[in-house]
């Protein structure tokens, strides 16, 4: 098995030095779906090669670069530079533009794109192949959606559903996740490790698999006690999830903005209250022992 893995790593590294994987959307339990914070309309989703522009909106998320002039706390992309969560969320919150003719046309085009993709069945491993001719259409279509419908919400158990598009072999999983519940994706130190309950298949040592141009479902669990309280881009109670793989040439991934369902928020608050009560109880017991 180790020998086979070594062969795969060598082969993929030699032929796919620039291959990527990107977070394309977040699907809220409240029925609201928004694109990933790095998504760029027009980026090909049916092409595995860098020459076609398929890597333009993939986030490169390297710890040594985060929070510097080179990359924000959410990384950087080839097509847009440092990732700016505020800029994308401002678009989601632009309620004044939601009924403009070009935005309505973008929504219609995006709906047709989604309908075409919905006819395909998942393959082994849970991934769905991207139809020929597919490109990113979700960004302009999302104009004003959060202003009228709210941000996507977690499920009541605190998990958030995300879609990860694997461009090529070293854009595979498994992924790791971090969630910022306080700074709106601005502060590197605000991110907490989060558990992924549904992951993208792949060799964790290098983010490799044989899949390409496929979409995979991902589910991320909010850290216990975390409550979405960030304010960014005109939105409040914002959480940011940042996902990435272990690709040697990356890591690659992306990020999404969301909030908690009322039930999930209540659970988090109750968890924190229980922790405080337990801490006070321990302190009282220690005083009594003295």
UniProtKB/Swiss-Prot annotation:
Coiled-coil intervals, chain numbering: none
Keyword Signal found: yes
Task performed by this protein: Appressoria-specific virulence factor required for appressorial penetration in host and lesion development.
Listed GO CC annotations: cytoplasm
InterPro entries with a match to the protein in the record: Egh16-like
Protein's recorded name: Appressoria-specific virulence factor GAS2
Signal peptide interval: 1-19
Glycan attachment residues as annotated in the record: 99
The keyword Amino-acid biosynthesis is annotated on this UniProt entry: no
Induction: Expressed specifically during appressorium formation.
Stretches the record annotates as Disordered: 121-140
Keywords: Cytoplasm, Glycoprotein, Signal, Virulence
Superkingdom field: Eukaryota
Major localisation: cytoplasm
Inactivation phenotype: Does not affect vegetative growth, conidiation, or appressoria formation, but redices in appressorial penetration and lesion development.
Subcellular location: Cytoplasm
Native organism: Pyricularia oryzae (strain 70-15 / ATCC MYA-4617 / FGSC 8958) (Rice blast fungus)
């Amino acid at each position: 098995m180790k020998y086979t893995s070594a062969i795969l790593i060598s082969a993929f590294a030699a032929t796919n030095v620039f291959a990527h994987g990107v977070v394309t959307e977040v699907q809220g339990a409240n029925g609201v779906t928004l694109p990933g914070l790095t998504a760029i309309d027009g980026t090909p989703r049916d092409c595995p090669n860098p020459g076609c522009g398929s890597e333009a909106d993939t986030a490169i998320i390297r710890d040594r670069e985060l929070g510097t002039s080179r990359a924000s706390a959410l990384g950087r992309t080839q097509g847009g530079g440092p990732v700016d969560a505020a800029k994308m969320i401002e678009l989601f919150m632009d309620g004044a533009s939601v009924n403009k003719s070009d935005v309505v046309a973008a929504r219609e085009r995006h709906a047709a794109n989604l309908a075409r993709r919905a006819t395909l069945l998942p393959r082994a491993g849970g991934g769905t192949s991207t139809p020929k001719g597919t490109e990113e259409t979700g960004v302009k279509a999302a104009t004003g959606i959060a202003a009228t419908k709210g941000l996507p919400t977690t499920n009541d158990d605190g998990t958030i559903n995300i879609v990860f598009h694997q461009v090529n072999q070293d854009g595979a999983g498994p992924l790791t996740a971090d969630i910022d519940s306080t700074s709106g994706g601005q502060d590197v130190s605000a991110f907490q490790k989060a558990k992924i309950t549904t992951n993208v298949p792949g060799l964790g040592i290098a983010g490799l698999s044989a899949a390409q141009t496929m979409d995979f479902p991902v589910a991320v669990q909010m850290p216990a006690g975390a409550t979405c309280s960030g304010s960014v881009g005109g939105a409040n109670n914002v959480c940011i999830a940042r996902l990435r793989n272990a690709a040697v040439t990356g890591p690659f991934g992306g990020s999404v903005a969301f909030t908690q369902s009322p039930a999930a928020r209540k659970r988090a608050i109750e968890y924190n209250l229980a922790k405080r009560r337990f801490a006070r109880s321990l302190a009282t017991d220690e005083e009594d022992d003295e």
